[in-house]
């Protein structure tokens, strides 16, 4: 590879990679699978939150732990069982949000000629895809059986993001304290002040919501998520 005379990305599929060998993958490869084959089953997607937390400190320029291909759109043609993804619309959005905020390589495991407009829109949301930028650094700051919370910061612009995920099987309210974001990346010294006012820019809907207080929260249906860019007033 070093003698080929041109840049090459080396992608490994040890499936799943062992975290204790992280140094080896970072030194000798660019991408490496952190999971077995990933398919459109909710239990596999829910488990990916644990895997991403395990590997989140090993994402950097030229080093990308790989969550595997995105099972969206029409699948299974190569296996003789062509079908539409089993993921619900909300689960698809949750998967895209996690892959992007974590910084996974983005590869689509679908029949491209059969992509519908909804799937295409999901795959081409520029604001969500911006999180893949090497200047964005993310951490999972909470994970339990019912919810997950990720925070990210763009080192170049200073923009801070929060992603809330409902991992439970019923509608639930997921919350994060501004103080948690402050401790992770730093917004400002007075983020814990109850008078703090912010605008939450929803990356998926494009809608803005003004809020005041110390807690950000959203009521989410089962397996749904929301991701905001937090704009200070």
Name these PLM-found stretches.
Residues 210-233:
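C-terminal beta-strand-rich structural cap/linker in extracellular carbohydrate-active enzymes
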Residues 1-4:
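Alpha-helix-loop-beta-strand connector modules within alpha/beta enzyme cores
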Residues 180-206:
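Solvent-exposed beta-hairpin/edge-strand motifs
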Residues 6-111, 142:
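Glycan-recognition surfaces
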Residues 162, 200, 223:
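Hydrophobic, well-ordered secondary-structure elements that form the walls
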Residues 72, 119, 123-160:
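Membrane-interfacial catalytic/cofactor-binding modules of polytopic membrane enzymes
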Residues 170-174, 195-196, 208-209:
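Short acidic/proline- and small/hydrophobic-mixed sequence motifs that coincide with surface turns
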Residues 93, 99-102, 107-109, 143-187:
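Carbohydrate-binding surface patches
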């Amino acid at each position: 590879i070093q003698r080929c005379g041109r840049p090459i990305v080396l992608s490994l599929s040890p499936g799943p990679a062992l975290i204790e060998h992280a140094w080896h993958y970072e030194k000798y490869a660019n991408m490496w699978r952190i999971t077995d084959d990933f398919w459109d089953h909710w239990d596999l997607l829910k488990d990916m939150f644990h895997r991403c937390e395990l590997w989140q400190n090993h994402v950097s320029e030229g080093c990308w732990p790989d969550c595997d291909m995105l099972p969206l759109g029409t699948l299974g043609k190569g296996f003789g069982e062509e079908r539409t993804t089993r993921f619900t619309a909300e689960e698809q959005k949750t998967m895209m949000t996690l892959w992007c905020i974590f910084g996974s390589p983005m590869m689509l495991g679908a029949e491209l000629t059969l992509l519908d407009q909804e799937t295409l829109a999901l795959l081409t949301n520029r604001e969500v895809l911006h999180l893949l930028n090497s200047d964005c650094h993310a951490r999972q700051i909470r994970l339990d059986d019912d919810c997950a919370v990720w925070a990210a910061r763009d080192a170049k612009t200073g923009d801070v993001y929060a992603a809330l995920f409902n991992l439970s099987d019923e509608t639930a309210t997921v919350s994060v304290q501004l103080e948690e974001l402050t401790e992770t990346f730093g917004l400002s010294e007075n983020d814990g002040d109850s008078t703090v006012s912010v605008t939450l820019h929803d990356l998926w809907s494009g809608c803005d919501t003004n809020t005041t207080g110390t807690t950000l929260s959203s009521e989410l249906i089962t397996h749904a998520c929301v991701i905001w860019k937090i704009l200070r007033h």
